[in-house]
């Protein structure tokens, strides 16, 4: 199976890329001109991804998220071949933590497939794919795990009906004040191999 990482943007891919709903291009103010920035997204392209396997990218960062209330992300999924993947067969996975193995929060969202060929923003960026997580809930997962007396070194899943389709998990002892790495990945939930591109 193959895994490719790339970029898609409004200037080079205007035939298939549109701004997410409600997003405007940033403007760079010069001394005599105003220039619009090139809005873009990272792409993860998986080919023949086996059942329950994950492919992901990560970035080392250093950020304190305590001053923020929400984490928002727009997600797009499209088949590499026509009718090659259906809604909810793939799940986007976002990990935030001190590291990616022992101390992290994990957010999962099942992906809806975008309407092929459409340039309507809500077709390209289905509302059901919007990740909108209240960061306070991530801290509450650790408390719920401790109350449940669950092992700290195992992935704990929060049972929360107010998170919609989001699945929130925690492992170890991450803290929002010391996020050192972030991961974005995709998992195949289908018994069949799947090929798709995720933005």
Give the predicted meaning of each segment.
Residues 1-199:
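Surface-exposed, low-hydrophobicity segments enriched in Gly/Pro/acidic/Ser residues
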């Amino acid at each position: 199976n193959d895994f490719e990482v790339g970029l898609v943007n409004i200037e080079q891919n205007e035939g298939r890329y549109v701004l997410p709903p409600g997003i405007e291009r940033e403007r760079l103010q010069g001394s005599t001109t105003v220039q619009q920035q090139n809005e873009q997204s990272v792409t993860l392209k998986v080919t023949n991804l086996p059942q329950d396997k994950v492919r992901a990218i990560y970035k080392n960062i250093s950020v304190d998220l305590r001053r923020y209330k929400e984490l928002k992300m727009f997600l797009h999924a499209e088949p590499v071949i026509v009718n090659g993947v259906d809604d909810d067969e793939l799940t986007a996975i976002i990990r935030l933590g001190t590291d990616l193995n022992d101390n992290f929060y994990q957010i999962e969202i099942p992906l809806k497939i975008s309407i092929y060929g459409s340039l309507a923003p809500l077709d390209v960026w289905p509302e059901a794919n919007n990740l909108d997580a209240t960061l306070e809930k991530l801290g509450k997962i650790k408390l719920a795990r401790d109350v449940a007396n669950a092992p700290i070194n195992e992935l704990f899943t929060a049972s929360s009906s107010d998170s919609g389709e989001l699945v929130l998990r925690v492992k170890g002892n991450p803290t929002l004040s010391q996020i050192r790495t972030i991961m974005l990945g995709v998992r195949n939930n289908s018994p069949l191999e799947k090929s798709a591109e995720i933005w």
